[in-house]
Regions:
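Histidine/acidic-rich helix-loop-helix segments that form or flank divalent-metal centers
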Residues: 272-281
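Active-site activation/catalytic loop segments of kinase-like enzymes and analogous catalytic loops
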Residues: 163-170, 234-271, 285-305, 317-325
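An alpha-helical support segment within catalytic cores of ATP-dependent transferases
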Residues: 21, 26-27, 143-148, 158-201, ...
Length: 372
């Protein structure tokens, strides 16, 4: 079914947004006006509603207020996923003027839910293998010049959220001149690590919460929340998947998956590094960039956008950042800063954090084989 563009639908702007949705549905579906109920919301201003029609069929309405959200990137990336044969919501109707998209309904079973229902690591692993295949498909479909570049300017803007929103706003923590200089040096290291990597399509939030198990397609994994996709570092989506905002993996399991991905990527002629130790370090430093950024983003969501659910996950990112910064001598100043922050604000068990991954320091492929 081709996408239908809807134009010149005038809504009563004096109504609240839910009343506008009701009015819009009556105009678009005059012979079968669906009921609508909240399906989900995300960290942006977008909301999603499940539309239920008289025959009990369902669709999803994306509500993206045009003064706050731009639907065009979602439409562009949706087309890229379709061409790459990656399952994602199909777009039926588009109303850019009012900020509404009608999408296919993938169901209610997310990968995050499915993982949490499995107690056995082997069963969890079985759920992850098809997701790696999706990531490989996405990267193999990459072409320069289509998506925005994930360049040094964007990376630096993201990293600056860490001192602005996490250190200053959340912790009321004032950096000394030397700490500011040291942090900027770390930022430059992380930026160079990212921009020097081979470039592919990057979902930019490729994590279990953004993978659905499609109820209309034999529970095959489908990708959602892809509108922020860019062209950037090959390790970004991989580390987003296994060093997640809401789920932590034992490092032995994580490492096994990273090696599996690396081997498959090499075999499929993706531009990964030939040396796994080099690839692993790129992966870890890319993860650190993401985690410092997310510490800032979660605080901004709390203080600016009044979304309080994210703040409770800050300790997970402190753990990630401490473990990585402890491993590499060039990150020792960041590690010292994180120790200072932890001692004053978080009181996490530092020895437990460090020892949980100590056997993987300075890792190469051959040494990994001792642990599997």
């Amino acid at each position: 079914m081709q996408k239908q563009y809807l134009n010149n639908i005038s809504l009563n702007t004096s109504q609240d947004r839910n009343e506008q949705i009701s009015q819009w549905l009556e105009i678009v579906f005059p012979n079968n006006v669906p009921k609508f109920e909240a399906a989900s919301a995300d960290a942006s201003f977008r909301r999603f509603f499940r539309l239920t029609f008289s025959d009990n069929s369902t669709k999803i309405l994306m509500d993206a207020p045009p003064d706050k959200e731009n639907c065009q990137p979602f439409i562009l990336v949706s087309d890229l996923l379709l061409k790459a044969d990656i399952l994602s919501p199909q777009i039926f109707q588009i109303d850019l003027q009012n900020g509404f998209l009608v999408l296919s309904d993938l169901g209610k079973i997310g990968l995050m839910l499915a993982l949490n229902l499995q107690e056995d690591n082997y069963e969890k692993s079985l759920l992850m293998h098809p997701v790696l295949e999706i990531l490989l498909k996405l990267q193999k479909s990459s072409k320069a010049g289509i998506l925005p570049p994930y360049d040094a300017k964007m990376l630096r803007r993201e990293l600056n959220l860490f001192p602005e929103w996490f250190l200053q706003k959340h912790l009321n923590f004032a950096l000394s001149d030397k700490e500011t200089q040291d942090l900027n040096a770390v930022f430059e290291l992380l930026i160079q690590n990212a921009v020097q990597q081979p470039k592919v399509f990057v979902h930019r939030d490729f994590m279990p919460r953004n993978i659905m198990l499609s109820e209309s397609d034999d529970l095959n994994p489908a990708v959602i929340d892809f509108q922020d996709a860019v062209y950037g570092p090959i390790t970004y989506d991989l580390v987003s998947l296994f060093r997640d905002a809401f789920l932590s993996w034992d490092e032995e399991i994580e490492l096994d998956f990273v090696i599996r991905f690396w081997e498959k990527a090499k075999n499929q002629n993706l531009p990964v590094r030939k040396d796994f130790g080099f690839f692993w370090k790129e992966y870890e430093l890319m993860g650190l960039q993401r985690h410092l950024k997310v510490l800032g983003i979660f605080c901004r969501l709390n203080y600016r956008d009044h979304k309080e659910n994210y703040i409770k996950d800050l300790p997970r990112f402190i753990r990630y950042a401490m473990k990585t910064s402890h491993r590499y001598s060039e990150l020792r100043n960041l590690y010292a800063l994180l120790l200072k922050i932890n001692e004053k604000h978080f009181h996490l068990d530092v020895a437990e954090i460090i020892n949980s991954g100590s056997k993987f320091q300075n890792l190469d492929f051959d040494s990994y084989m001792e642990y599997v």
